[in-house]
Each structure stands twice: as structure tokens, then as C-alpha cells.
């Protein structure tokens, strides 16, 4: 059994969720499987083990779970990137494009110091709109975005390619065809 197949087997697919035609890739089953979760975190961390990473930034909400584990393994701090209005202290904010509209995300203004080496983490990359916004937000406050890591890539939707075009190396552990 290959690494990709082994981890893929721990991801549940839910057809027609949240709307018809979508194949929702549910990582909660991977998170519930201790061996699969550990393996996924180890594989996301592996390229940067032994390198200086100051912070791991995780996008709401599953990026918090994965990002916290990655930060722990790298002995780095963790920074949540949240939807507008969810953080209690002074924030820096950016608007970003969604498939059908615009939203805003923010982080604490003092969460990252200029020049700090940051890895962006989330569970899945699809169109890349949210991840692109997060990279722009991190760079806006002076972060050196070393890489973006995702468990799942939906390559047909072009998100990983969008980040690579921004000179952000992308690490994914598996791909699924379609939406």
C-alpha cells in the first residue's frame, strides 16, 4: 500500500455536500485515526525539520487543528488567521475573493514580527482564494512565507498553482480529482 493510498483511505468522501455536484473531502476521519493523523503531520513537517521556522499560521478552522500540531513538531509558535471580527485584540485585515463573492480575514497585528519565517497550513486547497489572501496578509505584516502545506489538493481547481505563481512553495500529501 502506498503512502498516498494509505492516507487517502482515511479521508471520508461525502457526495453532494454542501451542494449537489460537490464531493466533500472530510478529514475528520483522518484526524480521528491516531496513526493517520500522526503520519500526516510528520509528512507536512518533514521538509522543514531542522530548519528555523518561527511561526505556523493556520486558516480557520481545520487549519487550526493541523497547524497547531505542525507548530508543535517544529517548536514554532502558532498564529490563527480568522474570519473578520473573531479576534479580541488589534488586528490587520485583508479582503479576499471567494468563488461567489468577497470575504475578509484577519490576524493579530503583533502575531508575527517582520522577517519571521512562516509556514501557512490548512486541510485542503481548492481554488486557492483563501490561501492567496492569507499569504498576502502575512506578507503585508512582513512575514517571510516559507511554504504553504495542505493535506489535500484539488489540482483541477488551480489553488496550488496560484500559490506557486506567488513564489510560495506548496506541499500537499494527496490529490483528489474533481471538486
Swiss-Prot record:
What would you give as a GO molecular function for this chain, any one?
adenine phosphoribosyltransferase activity
InterPro entries (UniProt xref): Ade_phspho_trans, PRibTrfase_dom, PRTase-like, UPRTase/APRTase
> Which Gene3D superfamilies does the UniProt record give?
3.40.50.2020
**Which keywords belong to this entry?**
Cytoplasm, Glycosyltransferase, Purine salvage, Transferase
Any idea where this protein resides?
Cytoplasm
Q: Which GO terms describe its cellular component?
A: cytoplasm
Q: How does it assemble?
A: Homodimer.
**HAMAP family referenced in this protein's UniProt entry, alphabetically:** Aden_phosphoribosyltr
Q: What is this protein called?
A: Adenine phosphoribosyltransferase
Amino acid at each position: 500500500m502506498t503512502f498516498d493510498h494509505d492516507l487517502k483511505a482515511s479521508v471520508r468522501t461525502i457526495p453532494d455536500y454542501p451542494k449537489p455536484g460537490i464531493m466533500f473531502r472530510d478529514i475528520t476521519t483522518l484526524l480521528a485515526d491516531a496513526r493517520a493523523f500522526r503520519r500526516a503531520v510528520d509528512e507536512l513537517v518533514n521538509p522543514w525539520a531542522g530548519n528555523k521556522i518561527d511561526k505556523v499560521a493556520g486558516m480557520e478552522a481545520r487549519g487550526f487543528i493541523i497547524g497547531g500540531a505542525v507548530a508543535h513538531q517544529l517548536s514554532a509558535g502558532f498564529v490563527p488567521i480568522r474570519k473578520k471580527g473573531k479576534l479580541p485584540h488589534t488586528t490587520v485585515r485583508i479582503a479576499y475573493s471567494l468563488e461567489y463573492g468577497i470575504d475578509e480575514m484577519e490576524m493579530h497585528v503583533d502575531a508575527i514580527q517582520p522577517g519571521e519565517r512562516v509556514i501557512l497550513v490548512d486541510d485542503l486547497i481548492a481554488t486557492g482564494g483563501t490561501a492567496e489572501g492569507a499569504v498576502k496578509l502575512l506578507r503585508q505584516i512582513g512575514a517571510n512565507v516559507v511554504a504553504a502545506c495542505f493535506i489535500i489538493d484539488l489540482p483541477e481547481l488551480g489553488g496550488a498553482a496560484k500559490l506557486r505563481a506567488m513564489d510560495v512553495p506548496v506541499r500537499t500529501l494527496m490529490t483528489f480529482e474533481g471538486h
